[in-house]
Amino acid sequence: MRFRIRKCPKCGRYTLKEVCPVCGEKTKVAHPPRFSPEDPYGEYRRRWKREVLGIGRKEK
């Protein structure tokens, strides 16, 4: 399934275009990535979050 709706990170408007018609900024897909229980990169993403944000459990 291909997502069509996009959002401008600068002005926050939704559009179907690759470039925002209001401010000219490149738009991004407005949908979050699909969830999978077998996420092969989930461990690395959670570790990065703990290191950068300083939250969650600490590794020994």
From Swiss-Prot:
Any one GO CC term of the record: ribonucleoprotein complex
Annotated coiled-coil segments of the chain: none
Highest taxon, organism lineage: Archaea
Keywords: Ribonucleoprotein, Ribosome biogenesis, rRNA processing
Ribonucleoprotein is among the record's keywords: yes
GO biological process terms, semicolon-separated: pseudouridine synthesis; rRNA processing
Single GO MF annotation: snoRNA binding
UniProt keyword rRNA processing, yes or no: yes
A Pfam family the protein falls into: Nop10p
InterPro entries in UniProt: H/ACA_rnp_Nop10 (IPR007264), H/ACA_rnp_Nop10_sf (IPR036756), Nop10_arc-typ (IPR023532)
Matches recorded under Gene3D superfamilies: H/ACA ribonucleoprotein complex, subunit Nop10
Record family assignment: Belongs to the NOP10 family.
PANTHER family: H_ACA RIBONUCLEOPROTEIN COMPLEX SUBUNIT 3, RIBOSOME BIOGENESIS PROTEIN NOP10
Role: Involved in ribosome biogenesis; more specifically in 18S rRNA pseudouridylation and in cleavage of pre-rRNA.
HAMAP family xrefs: Nop10 (MF_00803)
Protein name: Ribosome biogenesis protein Nop10
Species: Pyrococcus furiosus (strain ATCC 43587 / DSM 3638 / JCM 8422 / Vc1)
